[in-house]
Amino acid sequence: MLLQSPGDRAKTVIENDRVAVWDVSDPATALSFDAVVVSLSGGAAFLSKGATPSTAGRSMVINLKDHPSGPIANTTGYPLAFPRPGSRKILENEKVIVWDYTWSPGVATPMHFHDKDVVVVYLDDGELRSTSLDGNVVTNPFKFGMVTFNRGNRTHTETLVRGKQRAIITELK
């Protein structure tokens, strides 16, 4: 099935084999796939294929393509990325688990393993430093409304080194 266009008032921000993410400000057309709608005010909802998103303000529509990959076996000995201290599960079904998480300044998350691909919608302006098992350090600035897609099979810690940061994180099953 082809992905229906987001329309004139929406912008495609990510497109790959797993998802198509639309940045929308107005109600969109009926969905061609199941989707998670993440409001930039911090809420999230699951919508079934054929539904029409009802958005109040700016939202990200995460269209879930028919390409499940399933979780990757965790052989690292480290805990899974979620749940983690301070995280709150918003919803879970057979396709996704959606988490609300706020980083604390200067406090590293426990070293963890991502067994699933994730879509992250950032709700504040801040810089996160990621440190991998081999000691590789990468610092990335994330702004309000940014969206990223990260493949699973990663082990690292994260530390908020500047600003504030909260995100709605959608794990893809």
Question: Residue locations for each model-derived region?
Answer:
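Surface-exposed beta-loop interaction hotspot
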Residues: 55-98
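N-terminal low-complexity, Pro/Thr/Ser-rich intrinsically disordered segments
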Residues: 1-17, 75-82
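Tight coil/turn sites that cap or link beta-strands
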Residues: 49-50, 103-106, 144-145, 153
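Extracellular ectodomain segments of secreted/surface proteins
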Residues: 17-30
